Design a protein with these regions (language model features):
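Short, hydrophobic/aliphatic alpha-helical segments
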Residues: 49-69, 149-164, 205-210, 364-372
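N- or domain-start disorder-to-order transition segments that initiate the globular core
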Residues: 21-67
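Active-site cavity-forming subdomains of large catalytic enzyme subunits
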Residues: 109-273
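Glycine-rich loop at the start of a catalytic domain that most often binds anionic cofactors/ligands
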Residues: 79-101
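Gram-negative bacterial Sec-dependent N-terminal signal peptides
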Residues: 1-20
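Acidic, low-complexity proline/glycine-rich segments
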Residues: 22-31, 199-222, 282, 286-297, ...
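Accessory "access/gating" subregions that flank catalytic or transport cores
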Residues: 253-385
Length: 385
């Protein structure tokens, strides 16, 4: 309860300081708002979202206290998933907490191994905004301080240095770990465009370093927020290309003295693929007033294929981008955590022991901690291609 009151206080301070801040609640972050944060807009955290984070954290602690096997908390990660690293025996003693912290520090340090050129700071901010929002969904089980730190870093202009090369299994593990390393006062960050030691920046900005415990390390490193930032950047560029492409095509068609027949309303209605008629209408509007609408005896009956089929090319490119944006919106507003921490989880199929074992109920918390494959970004990856 003390932690929750402190979190609420921090949120209130942020809200007062940032009247025009983008409020995050884990549910409805738009790509437009995410880009605003990337460009420097401050953030605030909705109180109900931080309440979800607190309840999720309480559920994880109670589960650990009751001897449940929890990936990344009471057992290791990766190849060490069957190796017990924490045994609470019904009590979260100082010794148990110390062991948890050692494991978290070790996990962040051992995975901060990316290399190569550093990621554009705007994309780092975008990735952090995405991860903060997905944390606020309540599925990670991290302590509220982790969410607060994401907000503090964004609001105080502290941007972790993230090298762009390196991969380990699924998700952005070796890249995102550098965010956690900066939060614990290690590694490097950018402040006002200058690279400085994280410890120095945290002290100068009056940011208290994270003391990671429980599922904190896993929650910070095991997600796909960096990949989503890169995907959103590509989608944004594609959107800009598609915005000007009809104009470029119209100018080119005029230069060719081309034929408007392939994108007439009669033509596309005759073969009505999704989006085709809308794109054809856009091309006709671009060419409104053009000399191409006047009959010309020298004009070809049919243009070269590259011109004749452009309406299909642009239509399908637009459909692909629309589909990609839909799954991006799902990805940045839901939990990709493994395991997923679900407060007041749906009890479907709990008549089976295999399912019932994931559920926990204590005087303080009720829900489930379930192994997931939600780190899989195949829906986004396929549409990105």
């Amino acid at each position: 309860m003390k932690t929750l009151k402190l979190s609420a206080c921090v949120i209130a301070i942020f809200a007062a300081m940032n009247a025009n801040a983008v409020e995050l609640n884990g549910k409805n972050l738009t790509q437009q708002d995410a880009w605003a944060i990337a460009e420097g807009a401050p953030v605030s955290i909705a109180p109900e979202a931080m309440n979800r984070v607190q309840k999720s954290y309480d559920l994880v602690l109670d589960a650990a206290k009751n001897g449940r096997e929890i990936y990344g908390l009471t057992v290791g990660v990766g190849l060490n998933k069957d190796h017990k690293v924490l045994s609470a025996n019904g009590e979260l003693s100082d010794e148990v907490k110390a062991a948890s912290r050692r494991f978290n520090y070790s996990t962040l340090r051992s995975h901060s191994v990316a290399a190569g050129p550093i990621l554009d700071p705007k994309l780092v901010r975008l990735a952090m905004a995405i991860r903060l929002n997905t944390l606020l969904n309540g599925g990670s089980g991290v302590q509220p301080r982790v969410a607060e730190l994401y907000a503090e870093f964004l609001n105080k202009g502290v941007t972790p240095v993230i090298p762009t090369k390196g991969s380990l299994g699924d998700a952005d593990i070796t890249l995102a770990s550098h965010v956690g390393s900066a939060m614990i006062g290690e590694w490097k960050v950018l402040v006002d465009g200058k690279e400085v030691p994280a410890a120095e920046a945290l002290k100068a900005k009056n940011i208290k370093p994270l003391i990671p415990e429980g599922k904190d390390a896993l929650g910070i490193l095991s997600n796909s927020s960096v990949a989503m930032a890169l995907t959103m950047d590509a989608a944004k560029a594609m959107g800009q290309i598609l915005k000007v492409s009809p104009i470029v095509y119209g100018i080119s068609l005029e230069g060719l003295n081309g034929n408007v027949a392939p994108f007439l309303s009669q033509t596309t209605a005759f073969h009505p693929f999704p989006g085709l008629q809308e794109k054809a209408k856009e091309l006709r509007e671009v060419l409104a007033g053009s000399y191409l609408w006047k009959k010309d005896p020298s004009r070809r009956l049919q243009d070269p294929l590259s011109f004749r089929t452009t309406v299909y090319t642009l239509s399908e490119a637009q459909n692909a981008l629309n589909d990609l944006n839909k799954v991006i919106d799902v990805q940045i507003n839901s939990s990709d955590d493994n395991p997923g921490v679900m407060v007041n989880a749906d009890k479907a199929d709990t008549q089976y022991d295999q399912v019932a074992q994931y559920f926990i109920k204590t005087p303080k918390a009720e829900g489930a901690i379930i192994p997931t494959a939600n780190f899989e970004v195949l829906p986004v990856a396929l549409r990105s291609e």
